[in-house]
């Protein structure tokens, strides 16, 4: 972040009427709000141009509808204790969850990746041997991988910082279950 900040401060006085483009590797509307907020503080008006997010792609690959899911990011610098409780509640309430974990390898107390999440859920009473999960890494790239198994299987496994988890609790619920809409 220090180099990033230095770059912004160097560019600011030279920018004038020119347009500055800052590409993001993540979802600018999801896990990058702290950076966007800083850009607004420095440059004032900014235009955000969204793309297809890894969240959308992961949900699609896992066949988990976002309208029946909770989307949670742990990929923030602020404390995540409330987000951990939000994860528990969503799973207890039967929602699928699409989750961006928190890579922080230099500070193990803040590192909350799939293995740590699996242990956390088990320690909080979840039957992780019965919970289905996908972990997608480097999604939409030639290096994309997909782990599919149970949450218990994640314990001790390492995943990259380019990971998205999908806890799949979805069940089919097509419009055929709601015939009252068109039948008299």
Regions found by a protein language model. Name each.
Residues 1-4, 73-77, 138:
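Short beta->alpha junction loops
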Residues 19-20, 91-184:
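A contiguous loop/helix-start segment that scaffolds small-molecule binding in enzyme catalytic cores
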Residues 26, 30-95, 148, 156:
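Class I SAM-dependent methyltransferase SAM-binding "motif I" and its flanking Rossmann-like core
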Residues 1-49, 163-164:
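Class I S-adenosyl-L-methionine
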Residues 2-6, 34, 53, 82, ...:
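Conserved active-site and cofactor/substrate-binding residues in soluble primary-metabolism enzymes
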Residues 12, 36-40, 56-60, 115-122, ...:
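Predominant activation on well-ordered alpha-helical scaffold segments within soluble catalytic domains
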Residues 16, 42, 65, 127-129:
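Short, structurally constrained coil/turn elements
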Residues 7-12, 86-87, 117:
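Generic hydrophobic alpha-helical segments
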């Amino acid at each position: 972040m220090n180099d990033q900040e230095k770059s912004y401060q160097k560019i600011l006085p030279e920018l004038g009427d020119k347009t500055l483009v800052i590409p993001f590797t993540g979802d600018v509307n999801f896990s990058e709000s702290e950076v966007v907020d800083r850009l607004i503080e420095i440059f004032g008006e900014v235009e955000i141009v969204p793309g297809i997010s890894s969240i959308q792609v992961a949900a699609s690959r896992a066949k988990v509808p976002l309208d029946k899911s909770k989307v949670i990011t742990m990929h923030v610098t602020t404390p995540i204790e409330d987000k951990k409780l939000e994860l528990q509640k969503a799973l207890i309430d039967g929602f699928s969850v699409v989750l961006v974990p928190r890579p922080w390898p230099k500070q193990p107390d803040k590192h909350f990746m799939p293995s740590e999440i699996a242990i956390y859920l088990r320690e909080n009473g979840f039957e992780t041997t019965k919970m289905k999960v996908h972990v997608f890494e480097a999604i939409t790239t030639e290096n994309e991988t997909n782990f599919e198994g149970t949450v218990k299987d994640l314990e001790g496994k390492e995943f990259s910082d380019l990971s998205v988890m999908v806890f799949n609790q979805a069940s089919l619920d097509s419009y055929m279950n709601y015939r009252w809409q068109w039948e008299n």
